[in-house]
């Protein structure tokens, strides 16, 4: 019996896939089809896959062509599969010609001509593209525009900004003009403008991805989420850390008891990028420390320990009434504590520590760009290290989640509304000087 194996993602299974599978089957007596796992696709930079692994497996199975279906989960698995399953022929589309010649050492390699003019990428791209308008003065806007190039189903309609140094395609003179030419907005304007801009966009039934905080008070945050529901719009916090694979896995391991009961969390995030503006007291258009770094630092605290803390203390070193160069927030829960330290006028090691009764999780600086973390125990021999590919600082994964939410009309679960509201509540208390102590 001649055994044949082939691999693919098989997203949005189409005629071209089926013809290739039929030709593969004709090469032998028994066809094994390897379907790529979601995480494996992400590690290869394939982030636009529309269907889940099980949906793709079911689609391949429904063709009746495959005799056996396996899952491809890691780099180098093809050699393992060929040897383990006794494969005689490995086959793949001709667009990969030469790529798998090294497998000739283990079996015969056959490249099959693909059906011209048909591909999953083209099918995904042909779906109605979301026109994304970008609003704001920070250079992160340029990164977002660049990352849009890697995400199917999205195109940048233009930018509304007062920063003449930002170079993003078409520039609009007014916020309203950008709104009229966009289906959705990415907002990174000054936090004092967020509520007004988000409300105006949602009133016109535009979807919004906004750099947290989405508002400067709990009441405003609740109003925006309620309005989004009423208008059938997606409103998402843009916290890129939440969408990275490594960070998500780290949170799951922490909550799953890998380090025992969690007693303490310490998150630090600082930057001196704006130190020249701060030294000149020219910060009217600059994000302060609590808004720039607070939401990111609150993310793991609230995701792991929840938002129902007993009390908190905000300790700040102020440049003026609205601008903190350093802030420390201490949260006290019934059975745990957490501390965040953020600063734009102070420098510290930007690490994340999660302490439990059995061990601790260590995420090195810059922890908010999570691609690596360690679980450490009393016995170093038990320590575990985890690494996951992170492309585009997590921005492209954030954009994919946003587009998926718009297309599915379902709010994603990366950042809950309770968490979004809790972030705004802490920032409101900072401005109101509630639970507050000022350093001289």
Regions found by a protein language model. Give the residues of each.
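Hydrophobic residues in well-ordered beta-strands that form the structural core
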Residues: 33, 210-211, 235-237, 363
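N-terminal Rossmann-like dinucleotide-binding module
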Residues: 129-168, 403
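C-terminal helix-rich "cap/oligomerization" subdomain common to oxidoreductases
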Residues: 134-135, 160, 184-189, 401-440
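Beta-loop-alpha module in the N-terminal Rossmann-like domain of NAD(P)-dependent dehydrogenases
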Residues: 170-225
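Predominantly a Rossmann-like dinucleotide-binding segment in NAD(P)-dependent oxidoreductases
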Residues: 241-311
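Contiguous beta-strand/loop segments that form the cofactor/metal-binding neighborhood of enzyme cores
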Residues: 292-369, 399-410
């Amino acid at each position: 019996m001649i055994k044949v194996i082939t691999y693919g993602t098989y997203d949005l299974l189409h005629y071209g896939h089926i013809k290739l599978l039929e030709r593969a089957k004709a090469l032998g007596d028994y066809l094994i089809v390897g379907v790529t796992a979601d995480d494996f696709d992400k590690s290869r930079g394939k982030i636009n896959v529309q269907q889940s692994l099980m949906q793709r497996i079911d689609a391949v199975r429904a063709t009746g062509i495959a005799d056996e279906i396996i899952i491809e989960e890691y780099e180098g698995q093809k050699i393992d599969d060929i040897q383990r399953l006794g494969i005689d022929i490995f086959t793949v589309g001709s667009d990969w010609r030469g790529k798998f010649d090294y497998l000739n050492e283990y079996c015969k390699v056959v490249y099959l001509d693909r059906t011209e003019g048909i591909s999953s990428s083209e099918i995904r791209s042909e779906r109605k593209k979301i026109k994304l308008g970008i609003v704001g003065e920070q250079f992160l806007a340029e990164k977002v525009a660049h990352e849009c190039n890697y995400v199917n189903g999205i195109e940048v309609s233009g930018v509304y900004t007062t920063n003449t140094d930002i170079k993003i395609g078409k520039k609009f003179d007014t916020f309203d003009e950008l709104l009229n030419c966009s289906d959705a907005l990415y907002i990174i304007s000054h936090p004092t403008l967020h509520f007004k801009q988000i409300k105006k966009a949602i009133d016109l039934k535009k979807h919004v991805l906004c750099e947290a905080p989405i508002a400067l008070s709990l009441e405003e945050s609740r109003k925006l989420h309620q309005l989004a529901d009423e208008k059938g719009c997606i409103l998402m916090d843009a916290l890129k850390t939440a969408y990275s694979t490594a960070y998500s896995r780290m949170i799951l391991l922490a909550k799953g008891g890998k380090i025992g009961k969690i007693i303490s969390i310490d998150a630090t995030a600082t930057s001196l990028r704006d130190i020249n503006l701060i030294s000149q007291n020219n910060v009217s258009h600059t994000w302060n420390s609590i808004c720039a770094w607070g939401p990111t630092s609150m993310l793991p605290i609230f995701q792991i320990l929840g938002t129902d803390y007993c009390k908190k203390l905000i300790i700040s070193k102020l440049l003026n009434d609205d601008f903190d160069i350093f802030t420390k927030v201490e949260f006290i829960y019934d059975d745990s504590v957490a501390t965040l330290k953020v600063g734009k006028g102070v420098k510290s090691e930007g690490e994340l520590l999660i302490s439990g009764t059995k061990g601790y999780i260590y995420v090195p600086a810059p922890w908010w760009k999570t691609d690596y973390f360690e679980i450490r125990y009393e016995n170093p021999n038990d320590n575990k290290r985890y690494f996951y590919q992170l492309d585009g600082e997590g921005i492209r994964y954030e954009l994919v989640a946003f587009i998926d939410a718009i297309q599915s009309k379902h709010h994603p679960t990366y950042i809950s509304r309770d968490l979004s509201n809790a972030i705004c509540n802490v920032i409101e208390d900072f401005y109101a000087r509630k639970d507050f102590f000022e350093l001289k």
